[in-house]
């Protein structure tokens, strides 16, 4: 049986004694004493951190739905590129209970010490091995591209089981919110900048859009949504769009105005892990119709 905190060593030691073998003599009995070192390894922890979040799966609707009636569909997936730091959440002592010259127990780590830095791979997982038993704090420091940083730290404790269990395994899962996209156009009178209601715009894909598996789910030029300017001249596209290139075009001009053939380009990109919603707004102006008599 191994001491608490250690694992039984199943290896045998062969001892060969001859006239050349070093020994000590017992002072009382004069017996020869031969010393052999035999060590046990401490039990250790293995931490798996997994990163999850929504990934683009498809663009779907009913059986006869056209592109305007379809919605972007997301599913939970594994995320690569998340970076975590693992800290000691308490003083973590050696299992042998040894003390230093001042009588303090010897430590692997003091509370707050950085123990490991982990980065998730394609499977969304990262592993820290050979952690001394104790409690640790795990903090996300870098979110995957396209996602918002998860500010919630988690703790995990590795507790000794028995002398037959060399590795105690624990896991933590962190989820991230996708950075959302807000695209809008403000419709204005070109002469006095007053808002114009009643203009209809279409939003089109300006490039092929692919899902998480690399499959094209929307071809360039596809009409995705129509929206009408309100009393404030605001035209808001409300679907849950992924980051991509889009173009907005006026498809029905408001009464009393000249058609504007210009388009609004939205080259949307990730705005960093601290931004929940990437906002894109452009102004679009129409010239009033004039009459000469």
Give short role names for the model-derived ranges.
Residues 1-293:
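Solvent-exposed loop/turn and edge beta-strand elements of beta-rich ligand-binding domains
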């Amino acid at each position: 049986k191994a001491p608490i905190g250690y694992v039984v060593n199943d290896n045998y030691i062969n001892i060969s004694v001859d006239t050349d073998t070093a020994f000590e003599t017992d002072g009382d009995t004069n017996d020869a004493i031969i010393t052999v070192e035999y060590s046990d390894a401490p039990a250790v922890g293995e931490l798996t951190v997994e990163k999850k979040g929504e990934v683009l799966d498809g663009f779907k609707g009913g059986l006869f739905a056209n592109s305007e009636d379809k919605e972007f569909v997301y599913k939970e997936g594994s995320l690569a590129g998340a970076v975590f730091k693992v800290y000691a959440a308490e003083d973590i002592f050696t299992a042998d209970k040894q003390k230093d010259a001042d009588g303090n127990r010897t430590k692997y780590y003091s509370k707050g010490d950085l123990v490991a830095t982990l980065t998730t791979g394609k499977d969304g997982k990262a592993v820290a091995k050979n952690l001394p038993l104790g409690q640790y704090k795990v903090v996300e420091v870098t979110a995957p591209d396209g996602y918002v940083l998860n500010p919630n730290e988690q703790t995990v404790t590795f507790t000794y089981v028995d002398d037959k269990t060399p590795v105690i395994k624990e896991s933590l899962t962190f989820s991230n919110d996708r950075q959302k996209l807000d695209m809008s156009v403000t419709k204005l009178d070109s002469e006095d900048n007053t808002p114009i209601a009643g203009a209809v715009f279409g939003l089109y894909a300006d490039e092929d859009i692919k899902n998480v598996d690399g499959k094209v789910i929307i071809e360039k030029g596809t009409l995705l949504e129509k929206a009408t300017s309100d009393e404030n001249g605001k035209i808001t596209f409300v679907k849950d769009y992924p980051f991509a290139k889009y173009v907005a075009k006026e498809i029905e001009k408001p009464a009393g105005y000249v058609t504007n053939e210009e388009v609004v380009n939205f080259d949307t990109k990730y705005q960093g892990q601290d931004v929940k919603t990437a906002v894109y707004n452009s102004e679009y102006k129409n010239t009033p119709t004039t009459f000469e008599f």
